Design a protein with these regions (language model features):
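A short, N-terminal "cap"/entry segment at the start of jelly-roll beta-barrel domains
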Residues: 1-24, 34-35, 71-72, 103-108
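A short hydrophobic beta-strand segment most commonly corresponding to one strand
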Residues: 44, 72, 87-104
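Short, surface-exposed secondary-structure edge patches
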Residues: 24, 44, 60-62
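Short, conserved beta-strand element in jelly-roll/cupin
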Residues: 27, 38-54, 95-97
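Short strand-connecting beta-turns/loops that link adjacent beta-strands
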Residues: 18-19, 40, 59, 86-88
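Short beta-strand His + acidic residue motifs that chelate non-heme Fe in jelly-roll/DSBH
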Residues: 35, 54-55, 73, 78-86
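Short acidic-glycine-tyrosine-enriched beta hairpin
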Residues: 59-76
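Glycine-centered loop/turn positions within well-structured domains
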Residues: 33, 42, 71, 79, ...
Length: 108
């Protein structure tokens, strides 16, 4: 499945409105959602299977979210998402809102 400027194993839109959306992602080993930020929306990640790696720049952090865990990223915070386990797929629910969605890619 091809996203704004990346490819991952699958993305399923669960619900989408003018200012909120819910999507179910599956990332295979090596799948990466590149560095980006959102102008208005907050991202909430909920790990459902495998492990999810969440990297941020300000503050610089590298977190591994396990099954049952969650992580919040505020608007304008640069972040990169990847599969945290080369041995199995990572599945996560992403809730985004409240505000207009955008995907602003930034340099690696």
């Amino acid at each position: 499945m091809t996203g704004a400027s990346y490819t991952v194993k699958s993305v399923e839109t669960i619900a989408e409105g003018s200012d909120v959306r819910a999507r179910l992602y599956t990332l295979a080993a090596g799948d990466v959602i590149p560095w980006h930020y959102h102008t208005a929306v907050t991202d909430w990640y909920f790990c459902l299977a495998g492990s999810l790696r969440v990297e941020t720049r300000a503050p610089r952090a590298d977190r591994l979210v396990q099954v049952g865990g969650s992580y919040k990223i505020a608007p304008k915070a640069a972040h990169r998402i990847s599969n945290g386990d080369a041995g199995e797929d990572c599945r996560f629910l992403l809730l985004q809102g409240v505000g207009a969605y955008d995907f602003n890619k930034i340099a690696e």
